[in-house]
């Protein structure tokens, strides 16, 4: 996705979701849609949708709504759907193995092309049709397979070291699944998904709802 537009991170995270639902509407043959209809489908407040869309100028017309094909083309270009993003996976434990098996099958422009694991032999092995190498070969194989960003599913004690190596290689970004709070250069994008924190937040919401 292009970064000429400075938009909030929360809005950025919703863009792929908008694109997915708009694809569904297009497949159903819908020609136009209102923010209310999109809100009901996505379970997102219509005011939030209008505010998100406003960052990109006039995407719709008052009294008409949004042209589905126009939105489809707009979000496809905004999210660079015409370009394939190659991803490296670092850490092939339980979560990493699941990610390899899934390999973003619904996202035709995003693919894990190479993986690294400390238990892999020096000459590599294949898991779910993806080559897996020892981390000693990270710099060499990351470049060889043309990866742009990395997914980290390693142990917390190894996470920062791996992030430092990726930064030295000028990797564009990291999706961090470890609980470690990583430090990366300003030139690198970092997104952390801590499943235990998300679960605790869900438990808190459930418990407080019951009060």
From Swiss-Prot:
DNA-binding region positions on the chain: 17-56
GO molecular function: DNA binding; DNA-binding transcription factor activity
GO cellular component: cytoplasm
UniProt-annotated location(s): Cytoplasm
Domain of life: Bacteria
Biological process annotations from GO: negative regulation of DNA-templated transcription; response to redox state
Pfam families in UniProt: CoA_binding, Put_DNA-bind_N
Binding residue positions for NAD(+): 91-96
Presence of the UniProt keyword Transport in the record: no
Keywords: Cytoplasm, DNA-binding, NAD, Repressor, Transcription, Transcription regulation
Main location: cytoplasm
Record PANTHER family: REDOX-SENSING TRANSCRIPTIONAL REPRESSOR REX, REDOX-SENSING TRANSCRIPTIONAL REPRESSOR REX 1
HAMAP family: Rex
Cited NCBIfam families: PRK05472.1-3, PRK05472.1-5, PRK05472.2-3, PRK05472.2-4, PRK05472.2-5
Functional summary from the UniProt entry: Modulates transcription in response to changes in cellular NADH/NAD(+) redox state.
Subunit note: Homodimer.
Family statement drawn from the similarity comment of this UniProt entry: Belongs to the transcriptional regulatory Rex family.
Protein's UniProt name: Redox-sensing transcriptional repressor Rex
Species in which this protein is naturally found: Lysinibacillus sphaericus (strain C3-41)
